[in-house]
Amino acid sequence: VLLLSDSAPIGLLPRRLAWDVLQAVAAGAYADVALERVLRERDLKPSDRGLVTELAYGAIRQRRTLDAWLDRLGKVPAEKQPPKLRWLLHVGLYQLLLMERIPDSAAVNTAVELAKTSKGLARLAPVVNGVLRAALRTREAGETLPLPNDLPAQLAQAHSLPDWFTQLLIEWRGAEGAAAVASACNRVPDLDLRVNRLRSSPPQVQKDLAAAGISSEPIVGCPDGLRISGHSGDLRHWPGYAEGHWCVQDCSAQSIAPLLDPQPGDRILDACAAPGGKATHLAELVGDQAEIWAVDRSAGRLKRVAANAARLGLASINALAADAANLLEQRPQWRESFQRILIDAPCSGLGTLARHPDARWRVTPQSIRGLLPQQQALLDGLLPLLAPQGVLVYATCTIHPDENQKQIQALLKRHPSLCLEQESQLWPDQAS
């Protein structure tokens, strides 16, 4: 436990919280969950919330680059550093080498102070000071990290990605395309809102936000979407949030529900539904006049579906905690009863590394292979629930063909009566 005194340097708390997030992620937590927890526990001003987010997500995103600098600047390789020290040095190095508006003294002094006041690290405060000051000298001398000779390793180090992933990118897209995707994986993602047309309209929400000093613009090809620029602060305090005028949803995710072409009166099944972004979108598209079943294995996560539906004023969504792949066994009366089925399948998430920076360090070729049987089980298990002439949409947020095109090709071979109506893939460098 780290206690901060009144005489602690200004800006210590945001850096400490970012350090907490890095340690939690290294211990297996998801970055967005860990970040949300530390922000919820503290009543921070908007600028400090923004700093915590940028430091945590930025240092996680650039873990490989920061480790390479640690290997060069320290006497002990990054992998062999005490974990607490390694992640604290990442927070400091990220500010010095990869951020522009942070004073050098603030980056160094806060890191040294955090070491001094942290149990087990006090004796290593001089190491923190030495490494960060060495980084300053290196930066002032204009020195850069040497790149490996082979292209996959070059791309991986330059963009802080695993070698196996850049190797695949080159196979899929060629050298130039791979570089474009790798660069897109490190882009700071936009914040997109989806306007609830049952309660407001995009122009009205835009006007309400502008009155609170929040600028937004419509998203091309996304009729209900607004993109926020330069945001900070707690979104729950923004105009229209409590009233259910809008929710947060990435523009690419907003494109999924319309593919089902849902109609009022339909029975609609959303498998793997939590936290409810697509289920609520489906309800909005049919004017809340449908029977929608939001199914998820996690009863805890389903509570978020219910909470989001309630805030948006939607009454057509029924939540069910169940394994969607075995739904027919639990509800045999549901056979051929759904006009629309959405399978938002569990996947590697390789298309969303910009939004989920920790995924690049968690996903492995082995973990992807482990997902393939789950995806197949969902497709085969839910197909009998589809009514004649019904529509099934299989959606993922990955770019791996084994999880996408190959799953659908195999499904069509197993079920020749199916007709493929539409197939499309968006790459991270092509996203709007």
Across the structure, where does each feature detected by a protein language model lie?
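S-adenosylmethionine
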Residues: 1-432
